[in-house]
């Protein structure tokens, strides 16, 4: 929800938070560390150009999840030089319209290579695949060794988003 008032953003976040709690779902807010702290969301996801992880940790303290966007093993290594996130959001899997200035497409081979390098360097931070993922991609992506997937357009653009989400959950 870019470009909306802080009041509308907080009102919407609180509504989503209630739904997440009703379904025992984790509520991660993109980029807005102060909103996460104010409403007590579960955590924040920080993009490459967002607040540094260490600064977010100082503001939030322990007990909040902090995720970090990466597109390569080099990004992972660079991130770990200054801070340790709770997970890496890694992608894009394929082209997606939900993100401008898209990084190079990873596909399953990219995920396998990144996870292989992480194992080689004894890095055990969860990887969440993101970017252009559809329901049919999930088995192959999970077989690469990722720990989870993030979906947006494939759910929101479905004719029946609730049924689509139920179908996705049945694959996990």
Functional labels for PLM-detected ranges:
Residues 1, 48, 69-72, 91-93, ...:
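Short secondary-structure boundary segments
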Residues 1-8, 12-17, 22-31, 37-43, ...:
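Conserved alpha/beta-domain cores
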Residues 4, 8-11, 44-48, 68, ...:
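Alpha-helix N-cap and loop-to-helix initiation/capping positions
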Residues 9-28, 56-72, 104-128, 135, ...:
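Alpha-helix-loop-beta-strand connector modules within alpha/beta enzyme cores
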Residues 27-42, 71-85, 117-123, 127-129, ...:
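Catalytic cores of alpha/beta
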Residues 43, 47, 61, 67, ...:
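Glycine-centered flexibility sites
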Residues 48-58, 89-102, 138-171:
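Glycine-rich phosphate-binding active-site loops on the catalytic face of alpha/beta enzymes
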